[in-house]
Each structure stands twice: as C-alpha cells, then as structure tokens.
Swiss-Prot record:
Pathway: Metabolic intermediate biosynthesis; chorismate biosynthesis; chorismate from D-erythrose 4-phosphate and phosphoenolpyruvate: step 6/7. Coiled coil: none annotated. The keyword Membrane does not apply. Its EC number is 2.5.1.19. This is 3-phosphoshikimate 1-carboxyvinyltransferase. Keywords: Amino-acid biosynthesis, Aromatic amino acid biosynthesis, Cytoplasm, Transferase.
Length: 408
C-alpha cells in the first residue's frame, strides 16, 4: 500500500487568488499549489499591484491594493490566467497587456473578450496578445456568451462580477456546457466570501457587493491524484491518497465511481479528523461507457485505463477537449495507436477497443495530462518512454519523484 499527500487544487488555488485580489481586505490561503499555472496567476495579480507574500511554501498572504494598476501579464499556457484575469483588468487604472506561450495564442478567447466589450470594457484583439482598458468602474449588466468551448468563460466573468456597479448576469446561449462542476465551484467560493449568486439553468446572476477577505484552506487536487489511483487499477495494487474530501465541488472526485465501475475496490478510510481514499485494483480491469462532459479533464487518465482494460470503452461528451493545451482527442488516439492500441476518434469522444500494447515513445505534446496518461500505461507495458515528463510541472511539480517513489 502506498500512501501519498497530493498538493493543493489548482482550480481552487487560482480562484482563491482572484477573489483575494478583489477583496476589501487581506486574505490568507493555506495549502496553495505551487506550479507553473498558479505561479503565473500570482505573478499576473502582482503585476496589477496586488501584494502576495509567501509566508510558507504552501501559504500566501494577499493584500489587495486600493486600486489595481496597469501592467503586462504573461499567461503562459494557463487557461485560468487567460480567462479569469481579463475581467479583473477591467478595474485597473490603465491598460493591461496580455500575452502567453505560442500554443496559448490559438486557444479560444473570443467569448470572454466579447463579453467584456458588452459590459463596457475596451479590448484590442480577439486572441493573445490583447489589451484590456477600462474607463472607470464598468457598469456590468447582462451578457450572453457561448461557453461551450470552456466553462472558464463563465467562471472568469462570475469571479469579478461583484465589483461591477450593477453586478453581472451571464447567460450561456451555446451548445452543451462542459465542466459544470467547475462553475459550481466558482459559485460556492463566491458565496463563501459573502456574495449573493442566483442560479437558474444556463444563467448566473452575481449581485454587486463587497468581497470579504477570507482564510482559504485548499483541498488536495483530486484530478492530479487520479494517475496514482489509476496506477492501483492497472497493477492490481493498492494506493491510498491522504485527506480526500468527503464533500467537494472538484470534478476529480468522479474518479471514485469510475474506478468502481471498472472493477476496483474504492473505500474511505477514517484518519482522525480527515479521510483517506484507498483504491485496490481488480484481477480484470473492465472497460467503461461514460459521458465525460462534466469531467473532461479526467479523459487522459480514463483513456489510459481504457487502453489497458479487457473490454471496450466509449468516452463521450468531450468534443471541447480539442481546444485544450493540445487537441487531446487527436493526441490520445495517436499515442494509444502508436503503442499498438485500437483507439478511434469520435465526433465527441473516443472509442477504445482492447488490443495488445507494446513499448515505444509516448509523446506529451507539452500537455501535463497527456504525460501522466503515458506514465500510467508505462507501469504495465514494458519499454514505454514518456517524452517530456517534466511538462507535468504545469500543475504538479515533483510528479516524477512521487511516481518513482510509488513504483519503488
């Protein structure tokens, strides 16, 4: 049995940083994930005058300024920085310039930038690089967007909405909205700092109000935990993850039911005031038919499991993954098939049929979740080498070390 403490949630860390930057008073964030994505978020807010002090490696003290300032922001390849920070820039006293990695310049941005224009903010360009300029505090109001490419468009507007004079109502008018749990996370965190949010199907109204300074305690990143639990599933071993929350808005929590459906034994183990999650792999790993529209970020982990299962799998509802760090559907299909697998790309997902795999190079495409998917397969299939495993530092610095400790 291999127990492990997983670092804090990227999604919660970056939302807490935004709310702390916009708050009326200081905040403290415990359990901060330190990764490229979260460091980019902290640096983006610092560039607009927010004081973020590292009190410990995983603890920040955040002091918002009297007024946000103009600046230049490096988004890297962090979707949360690209989509959460432009609405914050609407409250700066001058232009805020955004740019990022070359790959980031092709990621969809039009929905949130057009929304800002509707709310009275000036935006130059429709993709990175772009500049956000506001003439005073924007009024806010009702905005209709197509967020079918990413729920981050909705969350980005909601997080800053309390600072708009009239608040903001966001209406989603496109196709099926992916990753609803991430929007639910945003709403829950807004309410935690005293903001009123009304929710109806495909519509969110955030009322204007003062965001309270807050002490945040960040849960472990459950999506980052999934490769380790998958390791138990494919090796018939047992893995324990410490401090798994019993009640959470994180999409990664869905891995519990997924692993059970694929034949694993999944149990909560009481550990004093907290709980650990223990997973034991089955003698025979079964395939799965799964609508993953709400949990798209788990697709690389589940696809790796499916490639090693004894029955076929069908993963659907994930057409939006074509717009992630890489086209994940195309990449997963290419890499599974490169190792002898049988993966077919569907209009909105993947169909994976059992096939004997062999060694080879698994390409990561500079995508952290692609890299961890290759690591899962490499536990079982001899001579699989993951190209650029270091890309996992985007959300999980030290992944390689923990993985090697687990493998022993």
């Amino acid at each position: 049995m291999w127990p492990q403490v997983i670092p804090g949630s990227k999604s919660i860390t970056n939302r807490a940083l935004i709310l702390a930057a916009l708050a009326a008073g200081p905040s403290t964030i415990h359990g901060v994930l330190r990764s490229r994505d979260t460091d980019l978020m902290a640096d983006a807010l610092r560039s607009m005058g927010v004081t973020i002090t590292e009190e410990a490696p995983d603890r920040y003290h955040v002091e918002p300024p009297a007024e946000l300032s103009s600046g230049s922001i490096d988004c890297g390849l962090a979707g949360t920085v690209m989509r959460f920070v432009p609405p914050v820039a609407a409250f700066a006293d001058g232009p805020v310039h955004f740019d990022g990695d070359e790959q980031a310049r092709i990621r969809p941005m039009t929905s949130i930038l057009d929304a800002l224009r509707t709310l009275g903010v000036r935006v130059e360009n429709n993709r990175l690089p772009f500049t956000v300029t506001s003439d005073g505090i924007p009024e806010g109001g009702v905005v209709e967007i197509d967020a079918s490419a990413s729920s981050q468009f909705v969350s980005g507007l909601l997080l800053s909405a309390p600072r708009f004079v009239n608040g903001v109502t966001v209406r989603h008018i496109g196709g099926r909205l992916p990753s609803m749990p991430h929007i639910e996370m945003t709403v829950a965190m807004l309410r935690e700092v005293g903001i009123r949010v009304d929710v109806t199907p495909n519509q969110w109204t955030v009322h204007p109000g003062e965001i309270r300074g807050h002490t945040w305690r960040i849960e472990p990143d459950l999506s980052n935990a999934t490769p380790f639990l998958a390791a138990a599933a494919v090796t018939r071993g047992t893995v324990t993850v410490r401090n798994w929350p019993r009640d959470t808005t994180q999409p990664g929590d869905s891995i519990r039911s997924i692993l059970e459906d694929m034949g694993c034994t999944v149990e909560f183990i009481s550990n004093g005031a907290t709980f650990d999650l223990e997973v034991t792999g089955p003698a025979e790993l079964k395939g799965i038919h799964l609508d993953m529209s709400d949990i798209g970020e788990l697709t690389p982990t589940v696809a790796a499991l499916a490639a090693l299962a004894t029955t076929e799998s069908r993963l659907t509802g994930i057409a939006h993954l074509r717009g992630h760090e890489t086209n994940r559907l195309e990449a997963l299909t290419a890499e599974i098939n490169r190792l002898g697998g049988n993966c077919t790309e569907l209009d909105d997902g993947l169909h994976i049929t059992p096939a004997p795999l062999h060694g080879g190079v698994w390409h990561s495409y500079a995508d952290h979740r692609m890299a961890t998917a290759g690591a899962i397969i490499g536990l079982v299939i001899k001579d699989v080498g993951v190209e650029d495993i270091q890309t996992t530092s985007k959300t999980f610095p030290g992944f390689e070390t923990l993985w090697e400790e687990m493998v022993g």
